[in-house]
Amino acid sequence: MRLTKLAALSIVLTAAPVVAAPQPPVTIAAAVASPARRPDNVKLDEGRKPAAVLKFLGLRPGMNVLDLFGANAYWAEIEAPVVGPKGHVTVWQPTQFYRDKTKQSFGEFAAKHPNVSIVTSPFEAPALPKNYADFVILNDNYHDTYWQNEKYGIPKMDPNAFLKAIYAAMKPGAVIGVIDHVALPNDDVRATVEKFHRIDPEVVKADFKRAGFVLAGSSDMLRNPADPHSTDPFDESIKGKTDRFVFKFRKPR
């Protein structure tokens, strides 16, 4: 009888879902070097310099992170071990870009990281947690707030409204890192974005200032003077090597 009970218990335990135990925080360098990262993400490191970027922006253990457009888990798989069990990473993904394949891959990733979750909403109506984030990252996507596309169901949007939602999601004193492809100065921002998927850094500075943010720093670590700025970032001649700015904005205390 005892053996029967033990066998039954073994079956129950085997069938129970395995939840990853919380792990103590690690350094940014250790998180970047982790063999647990997806190989397709690791391939992007040379062009993105994640360790240098996150160090510059100030990611630390215990932070609440808002990772915008982050369902590919490129940044989240580094952020999660760095913030550790006392921090949390919330990924926001537009519903227009959260299809079955992405849902599956992110679900598998989140199952291994108890301090990671995801929220989704339409691109044009970002539903973000209020007064939540100590740290926000927006990588290569701010220009898309000036983009519209019928194929993907993206209407013409108001960048100011998008930034207002981000501002409300951040705690006083929180930082947001903004990385994007550099465009040459042009009076028609939307036309430039439509053609090149790039944005003038001065437009970004002005937009964030108008939204109430303070520029706390900038870095040239991803600049590339050899970029002709005349192709979109998906062109094989420049893919992964575009001229990019890195801005660090802060929400005033």
Segments (PLM) and residue ranges:
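Class I SAM-dependent methyltransferase Rossmann-like catalytic core
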Residues: 28-56, 60
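A short acidic, Gly/Pro-enriched loop at the edge of an enzyme's catalytic core
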Residues: 63, 126-140
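S-adenosyl-L-methionine
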Residues: 101-127
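Conserved Class I S-adenosyl-L-methionine
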Residues: 188-215
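Core SAM-dependent methyltransferase catalytic element
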Residues: 211, 226-253
